[in-house]
């Protein structure tokens, strides 16, 4: 993880919903126990631990509620940022034909087409969370989504599955981006 980018959460209770989420502005490459906060179903911290939850806590809660996910991971990579800008006006990005698609939970064939929705990055987190939650209810098969110019959100039943989804989707984004570049300009002679 680059610097303080991204945020991670794990569901610690379902009824009521509670998350352990990384605090804002901490290095995600060197997370310590003090960098993780407990939050309730409305996003407010529980307990007296220092730090503040990520501004994007509402998105983690929306995903945990809608997907009954056990973990939610948000990353900022070059490929998710660039491709979300290139395909933002299309509302999403289709990933298909790659063997690595089978690394996504429930996908059994490389012939699968994964739709990765792209949302405009919005500082009104409750409004954005509402749009994300509506999409997740309407599109139960998606494994993640992109925030335009920002990064990837994905989830899993547990932290290991969520991490696998990050790895698979980031691979697919890079492969798609390189293929698009090769189609437009020919193969990169320097890689």
Label each region the model flagged:
Residues 1-191:
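Glycine-rich flexible loops
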């Amino acid at each position: 993880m680059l610097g303080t980018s991204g945020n991670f959460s794990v569901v610690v209770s379902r009824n009521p919903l509670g998350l352990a989420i990384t605090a804002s502005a901490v290095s995600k490459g060197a997370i310590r126990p003090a960098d993780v906060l407990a939050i309730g179903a409305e996003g407010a911290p529980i307990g007296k631990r220092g730090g503040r939850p990520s501004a994007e806590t509402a998105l983690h809660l929306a995903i945990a509620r809608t997907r009954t996910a056990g973990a939610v991971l948000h990353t900022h990579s070059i490929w998710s940022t660039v491709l979300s800008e290139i395909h933002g006006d299309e509302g999403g990005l289709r990933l298909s034909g790659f063997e690595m698609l089978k690394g996504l939970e429930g996908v059994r064939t490389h012939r699968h087409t994964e739709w990765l929705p792209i949302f405009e990055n919005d500082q009104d987190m409750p409004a954005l969370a509402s749009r994300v939650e509506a999409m997740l209810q309407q599109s139960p098969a998606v494994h993640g989504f992109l925030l335009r110019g920002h990064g990837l959100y994905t989830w899993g039943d547990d932290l290991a599955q969520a991490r696998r989804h990050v790895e698979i989707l980031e691979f697919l984004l890079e492969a798609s981006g390189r293929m698009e570049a090769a189609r437009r300009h020919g193969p990169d002679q320097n890689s």
